[in-house]
Amino acid sequence: AFLKDQHETVLLNPDFTNYLHYNLLFKCKIIEDKNPTELMKAIKNDIQIDHLKACHINDGIAMTKFMYWLKKNVGKIPMTERMISDHLEEERKKLPDYMGPSFETICAYKDHAAMMHYQSTEESDVDVKAEGMLLIDSGGQYYGGTTDVT
């Protein structure tokens, strides 16, 4: 908002600037172009690549342990969508660089799997059995990067 009374030069991408903000800059000289840092941020250096590899390997370890637990126990012990989601979170918490989920885990069984961005609640949580489809979309935030696994 402070720019509305300025006579400065402003670089903006009109594809990502809403009408209100664009019009607040009427006294400014506007240069329409892409953000020059976008390409620089898209190219990872060797250290960033190494960190991303490490976090994906570690997340893969947590996912493998989780999948083993799930396959070994589904249909043998009581489990619900929320219990399964919680168990996956516990596996990730065992990892040294784990900081938390990168987004809320979607654990959707049978009909719930067809609902986009479904989130299990106390009311909607259902028992999971050794039949039908179980969709899990989850991710972890690690010191070296972020994962997203479906």
Predicted region positions:
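Active-site neighborhoods and metal-handling regions in enzymes and metal-associated proteins
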Residues: 1-150
